[in-house]
Amino acid sequence: MARRRKGRPINGVILLDKPTGISSNDALQKVKRIYFAEKAGHTGALDPLATGMLPICLGEATKFSQFLLDSDKRYVVIAKLGERTNTSDSDGEVVETRDVNVTQEQLERCIASFKGETDQIPSMFSALKYQGKPLYEYARAGIEVPRESRKITVYSIELLRFEGDEVEMEVHCSKGTYIRTITDDLGEMLGCGAHVTMLRRTGVAKYPYDRMVTLEQLNEILEQAQAQEIAPKELLDPLLMPMDTAVEDLPEVNLNAELTDLVQHGMPVQVSGAPTEGTVRMTSGEEKLFVGVAQIAEDGRVAPKRLVVFRDEEPQA
């Protein structure tokens, strides 16, 4: 007997506005239940303290989540000067208190120094893994383990507000950048210590800020569907972004029906006008149905890497 699937095979990306106080995985599970999705995965964890854009991939879109993990991010952060915590945010314990004697000029100069490429050592209170366990589990046990520095790029960092001991900044950065670490480093540069009190992710890749939805809104839609006696998917599914938005920055290679059939069977194909190297997104026919992503092989052929598999009555969002 065929194994019964749990959930429906819905495809697409929902831009969740994660609330504060819950983990990214908790938020993911709530969205998965609301959509009754067979598969779901998020694209880069936010701390429980943090709010904002958490793209959640449903169904076949999970195959392309790595591209969003690797994409640029944007944040607005509020930091409190004068106090350093063991987690570099307000969820932790204050470990040091110092006077704040900082001028606007000093602050702007220190903030500007973070712009560009640099090496950053991840916080012990992060989800990075060491020997299979997240770093924060070691940290909570009072154990410090070695962490390698990682190359990050801060494309822009701007001071939005400086009032008393509170600093508000906007940051555009590469993947793997820890805003808590930047804040802690800033506090040390200023000689007074600092920690994050508010962190909001305002952008991932090129996804529009105004397409985010909250858990409250999703639950209200469920109630609305029940009141109207219609299937929830009729109201929920239009909120999904197409799954190829995760790879929209990749060069497009359009395939005819014959080539589409070959790549869907895992065969590399020769495509006139295709790039000579790198990763591409494949579309099919005049309607440009998203097929998947491919790598350009050494011989110039388009070699399928990750393919979309559609099943009967499966939405193609």
UniProtKB/Swiss-Prot annotation:
Protein name from the UniProt record: tRNA pseudouridine synthase B
Family designation: Belongs to the pseudouridine synthase TruB family. Type 1 subfamily.
Gene from which this protein is expressed: truB
GO molecular function: RNA binding; tRNA pseudouridine(55) synthase activity
Stored NCBIfam families: TruB
Annotated CDD domains: PseudoU_synth_EcTruB, PUA_TruB_bacterial
Catalysed reactions, as listed in the record: uridine(55) in tRNA = pseudouridine(55) in tRNA
Isomerase in keyword set: yes
Pfam families the record matches: TruB-C_2, TruB_C_2, TruB_N
Organism: Vibrio atlanticus (strain LGP32)
Primary role: Responsible for synthesis of pseudouridine from uracil-55 in the psi GC loop of transfer RNAs.
A single BP term in Gene Ontology: mRNA pseudouridine synthesis
Record keywords, A-Z: Isomerase, tRNA processing
Record keyword tRNA processing present: yes
E.C. code: 5.4.99.25
Segments passing through the bilayer: none
Organism lineage: Bacteria, Pseudomonadati, Pseudomonadota, Gammaproteobacteria, Vibrionales
Active-site residues, as the UniProt record annotates them: D47
